[in-house]
Amino acid sequence: MGIALMFLLALYQMQSAIHSEIIETPSSYNDNSLLEAAAEEPNSRATASESDLLDGLMSTDNPNPEQQTELEFRYPISAIGIGYAKNSVVLRFQKHARKQNFKYDPDYEMKRKSLQDNFMHFGKRQAEQLPQATGPGYYECIKRSAMDRYGRDPKQDFMRFGRAPPSDFMRFGRAPSDFMRFGRDPSQDFMRFGRSDNFMRFGRNLNFHEELRSPKQDFMRFGRPDNFMRFGRSAPTEFERNGKMDSNFMRFGKRSGVMAKLTKSQLQQNKLTTADGKQQPAEEGNPTDKAISMLFNKHQQQQQQQQGQRLQQEDRQQMKSSAEQNNLEEASVEQFYEP
């Protein structure tokens, strides 16, 4: 790679040496081809004579030609451009420019800094619009200082709406307890920061999510007593037990008419039926009672069937054992009476 690069550099140097021409002694100014072409033109003598005349007039009449280039403009230059069509320089002036004051004014700088540091200016003048100490409206500004609210006492806070200092609205820099007060007494502050822990609490304690609290704090907690928010229910022992529920608790589909007017004891007496000479209470209309009674009857039937099967198996075993004993006795008797 290095050998190829050196070869290319050598070729480039040879090419440049072939196309270049070393000039040891430069030619004179009169031998320039451009001047010779200009001299061959027909109007070359006229242009040369005019330039010579102008140079002669400037050298003879005006001994200081540099003063002719100095110009004084009435307005400051705002921009400088170039007109390529006319080959000229275009100057743009600022007609209504503010008169510059290059003197250092410490009061003006202090006012400017104070305005820059303040926040939330509503309709106040900017720092550039403040009257100068040498201007015509300086003394008028002093008279209107109360209106403009510049350089007030630190006790007079910003954004006051014509109220007395103790009842100011949205004043900055006051005590933390008096922030965003709506003309109220400090004891009746609304939306105060740093208020006590029991503010806007609905009868709750600080330890709201604590388990096993006292019965007095029964607002939406787990483990409340059984009689909380119950609608006409009986004692906890009779509510949703494995049996008959209370008849007057949200029963749907009850019969109307004569049956609805009967009492509970009369309904039970009417439902009693006789079977096999024994009085057995009929199944009540409650679906839970029906399901429980059906399960109980099925269980009793299964037990009876199992007991019957056991008794049959025992009887069969006894019969087998007795038959075997009889066979053995007969065989022994036959052997005894053989000749």
Swiss-Prot record:
Residues 319-329 have a biased composition (Polar residues). One of its GO terms (molecular function) is receptor ligand activity. Residues 38-67, 271-339 are annotated as: Disordered. The keyword Repeat applies. GO terms for biological process: adult locomotory behavior; behavioral defense response; larval locomotory behavior; negative regulation of heart rate; neuropeptide signaling pathway; positive regulation of cytosolic calcium ion concentration; positive regulation of neuromuscular synaptic transmission; regulation of striated muscle contraction. Residues 23-110, 126-151, 205-212, 256-339 form a propeptide. Its main location: secreted. Residues 1-22 form the signal peptide. PANTHER family: FMRFAMIDE-RELATED PEPTIDES (PTHR20986:SF22). In insects, FMRFamide and related peptides have modulatory actions at skeletal neuromuscular junctions, and peptides that are immunologically related to FMRFamide are released into the circulation from neurohemal organs. Belongs to the FARP (FMRFamide related peptide) family. This is FMRFamide-related peptides. It comes from Drosophila virilis (Fruit fly). The lineage of its organism: Eukaryota, Metazoa, Ecdysozoa, Arthropoda, Hexapoda. The gene is FMRFa.
